[in-house]
């Protein structure tokens, strides 16, 4: 998108945050709703006295979240079933997308706090938006009207 391969597109907010994408975020489509959350072993809360070990597929989101809290962290970047990291004592917590929480419960984990709500977003390439503003705005407005009709 950023390199001009497309004028507009749909992407999850998690991807926009993780990649620090240089695009215009035009509209929250309200689809694919979930949340990025910190989760840990049920009933356990990591103490603040040590560097927090965080397993995640989203290292940039996790770093930014804990930077705002002035918390020292050690990122353990994993792909796949990161829910096993706290169980195996590889990490204190995970930062991951949570929709229903079923996978967390199945692994004896629970949400500690929400990092950010996630949903699908309509985005535009900045150059395309500049040169095709009227067409893109018209499309964006029509999509927004249809979304309002659904509510």
Question: Could you describe each region identified by the protein language model?
Answer:
Residues 2-151:
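Domain-level signature for soluble enzymes in the chorismate/prephenate branch of the shikimate pathway
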């Amino acid at each position: 998108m950023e390199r001009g391969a497309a004028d507009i597109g749909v992407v999850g907010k998690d991807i926009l945050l993780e990649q620090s994408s240089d695009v215009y975020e035009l509209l929250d489509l309200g689809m694919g709703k979930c949340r990025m959350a910190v989760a840990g072993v049920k009933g356990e809360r990591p103490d603040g006295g040590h560097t927090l070990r965080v397993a995640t597929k989203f290292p940039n989101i996790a770093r930014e979240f804990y930077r705002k809290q002035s918390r020292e962290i050690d990122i353990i970047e994993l792909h796949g079933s990161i829910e096993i990291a706290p169980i195996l004592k590889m990490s204190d917590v995970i930062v991951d997308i949570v929709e229903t929480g079923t996978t967390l419960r199945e692994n004896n984990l629970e949400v500690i706090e929400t990092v950010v709500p996630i949903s699908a977003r309509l985005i535009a390439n900045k150059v395309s938006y500049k040169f095709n503003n009227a067409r893109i705005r018209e499309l964006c407005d029509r999509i927004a009207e249809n979304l309002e009709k659904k509510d």
